Design a protein with these regions (language model features):
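Boundary at the C-terminal end of the N-terminal hydrophobic targeting segment
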Residues: 25-27
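Second-shell loop/turn segments in exported
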Residues: 37-41, 74-77, 98, 139-145
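Extracytoplasmic ligand/sensor domains, especially the bilobed periplasmic-binding protein
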Residues: 82, 94-166
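Structural motif
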Residues: 69-94, 151-154
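Signal peptide-proximal N-terminal region
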Residues: 49-72
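Bacterial N-terminal signal peptides
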Residues: 12-22
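Bacterial N-terminal signal peptides that target proteins for export
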Residues: 2-13
Length: 166
């Protein structure tokens, strides 16, 4: 996925959370970036951080959001569900983030999203494709990618219609 893709999602999260906290006074707008910073999927966590940092730098350089600067707070879930819940609790309770970009693995996003939803913290996942991420009707949980049950149909149609079954 391109850095532009992550920047757009990060910008959407930043604007959405800023609008929701316009009366909340704080020196920085803290946004969590949660994903696998270590382990077999660490490359994805690195991409998350690079994209989020590029977006935060651009927004901050332009004056921030309502004059407030974005500060990123990283959370390494290593694509382990228990660790993801611990990261979510830390981001909400200790770091006091107003929004989260992440998690990557659906198996992490589903339990971590419960923590964010309970706290009223917006979460946007750039990579979790399991339909349950958004089917549960949690108000503050969003995704920027297709669902597993949609991707197969689109891929199948492409193979039949464009590649002619090759």
């Amino acid at each position: 996925m391109s850095q532009t893709f992550y920047k757009k999602g990060f910008l959407a999260l930043a604007v959405a959370t800023a609008l929701g906290v316009s009366t909340f006074v704080q020196a920085d707008l803290k946004i969590g970036v949660a994903g696998p910073m270590t382990g077999a999927n660490a490359a994805f966590g690195e991409q998350y951080m690079k994209g989020a940092q590029a977006a935060a730098d651009a927004i901050n350089k332009a004056g921030g959001i309502n004059g407030e600067k974005i500060k990123l707070v990283a959370g390494d879930d290593a694509c382990e569900p228990k660790q993801a819940v611990a990261v979510a609790n830390r981001l909400v309770d200790q770091d006091k983030v107003i929004g989260v970009v992440g998690h990557f693995c659906s198996s992490n996003t589903i339990p971590a999203s419960e923590v964010y939803a309970d706290a009223g913290v917006i979460m946007i996942t750039p990579g979790s494709t399991n339909p349950q991420v958004t089917e549960r009707g949690l108000d503050a949980v969003f995704r920027m990618c297709g669902r597993d049950d949609q991707q197969g149909i689109v891929a199948g149609d492409y193979i039949v219609d464009v590649l002619k079954g090759k």
